Amino acid sequence: MKLKEVTEGKVRIFVPDPKEYMIEGKFDPSWAPVFYNPKMTFNRDLSVIVVSLLKPKIILDALSATGIRGIRYYVESWKSEQLILNDKNSTAASLIQINVKNNGIENAKIFNKDANALLYEIKSEYIDIDPFGSPVPFILSSINATIRNGIAAFTATDLSPLEGSSRTSCRRKYDAINYKLSSSKELGLRILIGKIIREAATLEKTVHPLFSFYADYYYRLFVIVESGARKADENINKNLKYFGECPRCGFQTFVDENCKTKCPICGENFIIIGPLYIGPLHNMEFLKRMIDTYSDFNYLSSFNRIQKLLNVIEKEAKYKSVFYNISKLASKLKVSAIPPIDSILECLGDASKTHFAPTGIRTDKGYEEIIRCVKSLR
């Protein structure tokens, strides 16, 4: 395997040389013997900031590939007492050895095991699951392996089922009914969180989002893992419901059950999806710490993008409602000219943009008030 040295953040690692694995002049990271995706640098950059605040004693990256994620945590975030890197691909495990040594890390434990098998053998304060596709096969084992009040982090790149484009796949993987709706970018994340909550409950554990976001073609989520059957029951009863959108007028709301429910505005039957999580997507105290800290990481290649994302999330996080997609709403209302988002925000007064969609707004003001602004500004 021919290798190429690359720099990401403050580390230098060896990865398979893309030129050796091109097909008709094109390259996909999955074609190489060991997976390395430079397009996930933003994901890893933000994760470095999160881990720097958590300072876990043990870090476990269960699907390490080149080892880039765990190595960056150790070098840039926090020199944990123990760094555990694993990949079931023996070629990857050998490459991890090289990259760990190349970055002067002496206390790393490297495994060449199936991720689930390892997760049932080891407990950790911080566990990272960054798979190629869905994290579902690893949810139960990773929650089981996370100690009380520890953190589990998940990446999901299978947006087709989560956003409602592949309904049967969503039902199979996430045990949720799904349709493509106006706010599916956010609803997909809520379906993912709902699935993790239900899986954790089978272990008499529960989870609460610490920080989460959507970017490019994936969701990234950090959850606090708590123990106790009572806490699990309380979280399910309080925060797992369904979501309804009116196909005629665009009114949307959370609903208690998956049953025929009529829109209170126009009387049309709702399209119902779920179950999904309806609570806050971030821990506000932790979010404030991120905003106070991220400037220390101005060397990151995606620093400006991180700054923009956190600025938007800080504003939208205070609202409890799912965002309204003004473009889709205007279409349902037969409004030909979509008003500028900034004008709608000014009209509403108490509202913000959302990082989920460029034409989305988030507000706790009522549907009628939103419609008034959309129609008055057309």
UniProtKB/Swiss-Prot annotation:
Transmembrane segments: none
Keyword flag Protein biosynthesis: no
Domain Trm1 methyltransferase, residue spans: 4-374
Residues binding S-adenosyl-L-methionine, per UniProt: R44, R69, D87, D114, A115
Domain of life assignment: Archaea
Keywords, alphabetical: Metal-binding, Methyltransferase, RNA-binding, S-adenosyl-L-methionine, Transferase, tRNA processing, tRNA-binding, Zinc
One BP term from GO: tRNA N2-guanine methylation
Catalytic activity of the protein: guanosine(26) in tRNA + 2 S-adenosyl-L-methionine = N(2)-dimethylguanosine(26) in tRNA + 2 S-adenosyl-L-homocysteine + 2 H(+)
Family: Belongs to the class I-like SAM-binding methyltransferase superfamily. Trm1 family.
NCBIfam families the UniProt entry points to: PRK04338.1-7, TRM1
Function: Dimethylates a single guanine residue at position 26 of a number of tRNAs using S-adenosyl-L-methionine as donor of the methyl groups.
Protein name (Swiss-Prot/TrEMBL): tRNA (guanine(26)-N(2))-dimethyltransferase
